[in-house]
């Protein structure tokens, strides 16, 4: 289907002067790289983009470049878990090499949990939809040493290989497993300036190692006493509706900023408005068919809440992590400081009641 899309856009480009092709999610960044290459538009190389979409290759490249790395190993879904018991370091994390939004990511603390986790992941990777999306990658599982510490993410734009940081998000809720739902993101960060500079240096080194030289990036890291560890480095902007929380001086949205940058406009002096803002990705907690969501009006009435948007409709399937890949919706808030925003989001979420039908 990609070839058909490329041909259609080539035909369209004969009538219009295309300046940029931008992928907006994990599925479209490869197409964007292929299109840019065929249209001779400046872009990240296809090889670099593919590195960001394969967690094993990304880990290998980052380790080769000298960045801090956990112990890791890739093994086939057809291998017997006992075959690699001798190499394991507990706790460790199991994950598919190609999925996002924490889908399939599991912390395991023992040989027994490792075996059960491998079985669950093998079942997930054998599902038709997942297999089609992953191709050969659906045959592999990545195991890596668990990295303790505080988790943050960096939203940025890269021009000529140089990272321009747009926001550093703190994740104030503990993410220790066994599953890793990304719930609350708050910006601006409350980390001290020295640590922020250190994180940005690590992010810049990762981009250089992976060959990402242009466009939006979303980078996730963990920080502990040993230093900064890259978890993910995606050649796209933040996922879902989370970008709504980013508002720049002059009223610009993240999407407008990305477009301006891709057209060669200077965005170096762009700054976020000076206000604590946050988003909560409302988790899917129970498997079943969604029937109704109660409490939306009560949640919106909580002081500090600016918006609530649901993304799963009544009649649709609810599938929690680690197998699911969709959030119930998004809650947005603002306040005088990070603690206020966190409390507001948690209070609003407490008003929500999900009615579902078990299957």
Language-model segment annotations:
Residues 197-219, 225, 234-291:
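Active-site "cap" helix and flanking loop/linker of ATP-utilizing ligase/carboxylase catalytic domains
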Residues 1-77, 322, 327:
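Conserved N-proximal alpha/beta basic substrate-recognition cap immediately N-terminal to
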Residues 68-70, 91-94, 111-148, 179, ...:
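Conserved ATP-binding module of the ATP-grasp superfamily
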Residues 64, 259-359:
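Peripheral (often C-terminal) accessory segments that flank ATP-dependent C-N-forming ligase machineries
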Residues 106, 145, 187-188, 247, ...:
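Short, well-ordered beta-strand elements within core beta-sheets of diverse protein domains
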Residues 90-108:
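Conserved anion/nucleotide-ligand pocket segment
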Residues 75, 105-110, 157-159, 224:
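Short beta-strand-to-turn element immediately C-terminal to the catalytic PLP-Schiff-base lysine
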Residues 119-173, 194, 198-201, 218, ...:
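Phosphate-binding site of ATP-dependent enzymes
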